[in-house]
Structures are given as C-alpha cells and as structure tokens.
Swiss-Prot record:
This is Septin-8. Residues 322-408 form a coiled coil. Residues 376-391 have a biased composition (Basic and acidic residues). Residues 376-397, 409-429 are annotated as: Disordered. Filament-forming cytoskeletal GTPase. May play a role in platelet secretion. Seems to participate in the process of SNARE complex formation in synaptic vesicles. SUPFAM superfamilies: P-loop containing nucleoside triphosphate hydrolases. It comes from Plecturocebus moloch. Residues 51-58 are annotated as: G1 motif. GO terms for molecular function: GTP binding.
Length: 429
C-alpha cells in the first residue's frame, strides 16, 4: 500500500499542472526578498593567488580592490610552499563583502619543485572538507558559516615570452578539477606588444594540448553572453598592477612611471587590467561562486559520499535510504573486521609457529654447541690427566735419583772422614 501511494505521489510530482491566478497574490516579490536577504547576509569571495615570489600578486590585489591590504613581505628562501590566508571586510555602497585572499608563499622557490602543487591542492580540499562536515552536522548553521572554499585561482604566469614552465602546466593540471583557474600574465609591461600577442597564443595552445581546463566566462546568460564571449578570446589577461598615481595630462591616474614613458593601469591600450577587473568582479563574481559550489564542491562531495558508502539509485529501483546505507556499510564494516581479525589470527599463529621453529633450531644449535664443548672439555681433561701422570712419574724418578745421589754423597763423606782416623792410629802404633 505504501509503495502504491509513493508511486502515485511520484507520478503527481512528475506532471505539474498550470493554473491561472484570479488576482494578485504577491510572490512576484520573491526576487526583491532574495536581494534584501542577500544584502543583509552579505557575500563572501575567496581568491587564491599562485605565482612565483615577487611577481606582483600583492600589488595586483591592492590595485583590483583599490585599497591597501596589509601583507607580510615574502622571502625567496622558503623551504616549502605554504598557504597564507588573509580575510578582510569590505563595503561598497550598502553591500558587504568578506574577502579572503590566499597567497601561495614560496611557490616556485625550491630547487625540487615536483611537489610544489601539493600544499595548494591539500588546502583547497581542506576547505571543501570543512564545508562538507558543516553540511553533515545534525545542527548545522550554513547561514552563519564562513565559507572559505576557493572561488577563483588567479594563476600568475612569468612573462618569459617563450612558453609555459613545466611547473605551471603541472600545477594548473592538478588544480583545474578543484578550482576556477584564470591565467594572467604578470608584469606585462616587461615585454613588447608583439611578443605579448605571440606569448598569449603560445600559452593557450599549450593549455589545450595538455588538457588543462581553465575557467571560461559563461555565455549562456543573454545579459553577459556577448561581452563574455569577447573576453574569452583575450585570455590569458596581460596585467600591470600599481597603486601609485601619476599625472597624465590634467588628471591623476594609476600607472607605472618609467624613463621611457608611463604605463597606465586602467588604459586598455596598455594592459588588460580593466578586462580582468570587469570579468572577475563586476560581471562574473557570482558565477565563480556558483561554479565553485555546483561543480568543484559537488565533485568533491560526491567522491567523499561514495567513499562513505552512499550512492544514487538506478532509474528502475527505489532510492537508497539512510538506514539501508547504514546497514550495508555496517555489514561491510563487520565483514571487513572479521576478515582482518582472521588475518591477524592467522598471522599470529604463523608467527608463533615460526618462533617455535626458531626456538627449536636455537635449542638444537645450543645442544650441539654444548656437546662439542663437553667433548673438548673431556679431551682437555684427558690431556691434563696424562700430563699430571707424566709429571708424577718424572717427579718420582727425580726423587729416586736424588735419594741415590744423596746416599752416594753420604757414603763418600763417611769414607773421607774415616781416613784421618786410620792415619792417627797408625802413628800411635
């Protein structure tokens, strides 16, 4: 019965009916309500800056938002890449923006650059994981949650004029499925316009040939489709950053002063800074936020939930409930636990057998060694006994010879002492 009701409700939901209203209801104010709620809540926008030390990341951020962010000066002697986030509260008119700028400090400064991308990937995944954990809470509060997911990665390319470095290709390839990448050529005033044009073509060709997916400004919205299509053709943007003001004619402009002339930051004939600012902030900021949530975060979330045992149902079957998923995961866990216990028990038994064999082998070796030492001891004892007997025999022979010699000496002494007495007797006669 329950299954029939569920099918009936499902069919009803699949076939909505169109009705006409007899008068004004009021839900046409929903867009205004949404705008009012969004303005009250405020917005968050998180930018990841990746590029070599000294390439102008901090200067460009100051120029983009027309302010001065307090940042520590980075050293060229970092032992590893570390991510340094800084959060600022900005306000323009009545719109609040919580801006987080994450700098990849030390990127490209190490001799071994094979794993330079790893801390960046780990940081992006960590922000996804934090958001996922907040979503999975029983009592979650996403309204007040400070979303730290990276919305855009500005990848600063060194203006060599030749081609992309292998480090750039590897890093962007590792990041393109996790974040919206906008490649920019930094310090574009250091190479000529002709070299810059060739460099842009070379960069885009290398990105395409290596399968690197960069962020494309959306063309499905009629309001911005035309300008976005034009701007897509200008990628990568060649930018110049500066917070210094230089007098050009009768007005002050942000520019870089050189002995040979002035490079105006906001002059589109000099660089693409205005194009970058328009595309990044004025036109596509919300799309970058949406792409981060609906594409990159959803990919991470799907992979994580599949690892946890969740999965979508087939078209012909009923969706899996949380209880079914839990029970299936519990059975899988218990089965895995039993298998591990059996493996450990078998390993323990094998280890005991191996130990017993080793002990028996040691015992046999010790017994053989003991028997060998015993034989050696007996042999030595026999030799000592023979030596003792020989010594006793020699001692006895020596004593006999000594006694014989003493007897002979005594007889000789006695005979010698009798001769004077005989002479005295003869004289008396």
């Amino acid at each position: 019965m329950a299954a029939t009701d569920l099918e009936r409700f499902s069919n009803a939901e699949a076939e909505p009916r169109s009705l006409s209203l007899g008068g004004h209801v009021g839900f046409d104010s929903l867009p205004d309500q949404l705008v009012s709620k969004s303005v009250t809540q405020g917005f968050s926008f998180n930018i990841l800056c990746v590029g070599e030390t000294g390439i102008g990341k901090s200067t460009l951020m100051n120029t983009l938002f027309n302010t001065t962010f307090e940042t520590e000066e980075a050293s060229h002697h970092e032992s590893c890449v570390r991510l340094r986030p800084q959060t600022y509260d900005l306000q323009e008119s009545n719109v609040q923006l919580k801006l987080t700028i994450v700098d990849a400090v030390g990127f490209g400064d190490q001799i071994n650059k094979d794993e330079s991308y790893r801390p960046i990937v780990d940081y992006i995944d960590a922000q996804f994981e934090n958001y996922l954990q907040e979503e999975l809470k029983i009592r979650r509060s996403l309204f007040d949650y400070h979303d730290t997911r990276i919305h855009v990665c500005l990848y600063f390319i060194t203006p060599t004029g030749h081609s992309l470095k292998s480090l750039d290709l590897v890093t962007m390839k590792k990041l393109d499925s996790k974040v919206n990448i906008i490649p920019i050529i930094a310090k574009a005033d250091t190479i000529s316009k002709s070299e810059l044009h060739k460099f842009k073509i070379k960069i885009m060709g290398e990105l395409v040939s290596n399968g690197v997916q960069i962020y494309q400004f959306p063309t499905d919205d009629e309001a911005v489709a035309e300008i976005n299509a034009v701007m897509n053709a200008h990628l990568p943007f060649a930018v110049v950053g500066s917070t210094e003001e230089v007098k050009v004619g009768n007005k002050l402009v942000r520019a870089r002063q050189y002995p040979w002339g002035v490079v105006q930051v906001e002059n589109e004939n000099h660089c693409d800074f205005v194009k970058l600012r328009e595309m990044l902030i004025r036109v596509n900021m919300e799309d970058l936020r949406e792409q981060t949530h609906s594409r990159h975060y959803e990919l991470y979330r799907r992979c994580k939930l599949e690892e946890m045992g969740f999965q979508d149902s087939d078209g012909d079957s009923q969706p899996f409930s949380l209880q079914e998923t839990y029970e299936a995961k519990r059975k899988e866990f218990l089965s895995e636990l039993q298998r591990k216990e059996e493996e450990m028990r078998q390993m323990f038994v094998n280890k005991v057998k191996e130990t017993e064999l080793e002990l028996k082998e040691k015992e046999r070796e010790l017994h053989e060694k003991f028997e060998h030492l015993k034989r050696v001891h007996q042999e030595e004892k026999r030799k000592v006994e023979e030596k003792r007997r020989e010594l006793e025999e020699e001692t006895s022979a020596f004593n006999r010879r000594k006694a014989a010699v003493e007897a002979l000496q005594s007889q000789a002494l006695h005979a010698t002492s009798q001769q004077p007495l005989r002479k005295d007797k003869d004289k008396k006669k």
